[in-house]
Amino acid sequence: MTGHKPQSTEETPQMANPLDFVTPTEFVELPSKGRYPTGHPLCGQDTIEIRYMTAKDEDVLTNRSLLKKGLAIERLLTNLIKKNSIDASSLYIGDRNAILIYARASAYGNIYKTKVTCPGCTEVSKHGFDLNEHNVYHGDDIEDTGITTNGGITFTTTLPLSTIEAEIRPLIGTDEISMSKKNKNIKNMTSLVTDQMRYFVVSFNGYTDKKTINLVIDNMTAMDSKHLRNTFKVISPDLQIKDNFECPACGHEEEMTVPFGADFFW
């Protein structure tokens, strides 16, 4: 009787697939320097790891359904962020802008050529922006401004005319998405200033209910409104690309800021 030959317990070595590779990543510095509430995945983190853009990401940017809904950039950000625990919509707008700039530069180069409408004569011309020449603001330059910080998450200022104490915060992705959807449904764009305030105001004299906040905003003097908007800029971390634009048609010169939308990548 022939004995049964035992099978080897060693696995047959697998040949490496030459097409197996990991999408490269890079670390992007956060303008906010991780000034997020306790418990947020980026709280105290100076950087965020993102993936390089792929052909699938390009599909997202050309998806008509997503573009129509204004969700193309949101889907792209979600795909780029490596850690699934980080919700792109919870990031400060300045941090989101930083991710978009680095992703675009690594995918298509640092020179971004786009159409610019001259503020002087409305002539449309091409202008190139260098994405490496960006301005980073951490949103923490509040010394001698009369602004007080509440743990770096919200900030308080006193309106000069009404003396109302206003508590405000930087905007996040959720706010940006909501404002974008609302603006698409509004033909009259004259309320953009007050609409933005409704998002970044946390309270007036300690009152946090929307009814009180809307009442104060709708009746706010121009002086108080300007002060509140300027304070909002001071406390908001951001990364912007600005360049001096000279119109080839009329010679008008002005500093222009690059807008961030789906067409930023084309």
Where are these regions (language model features)?
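Long C-terminal interaction/binding lobes of large macromolecular proteins
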Residues: M1-W266
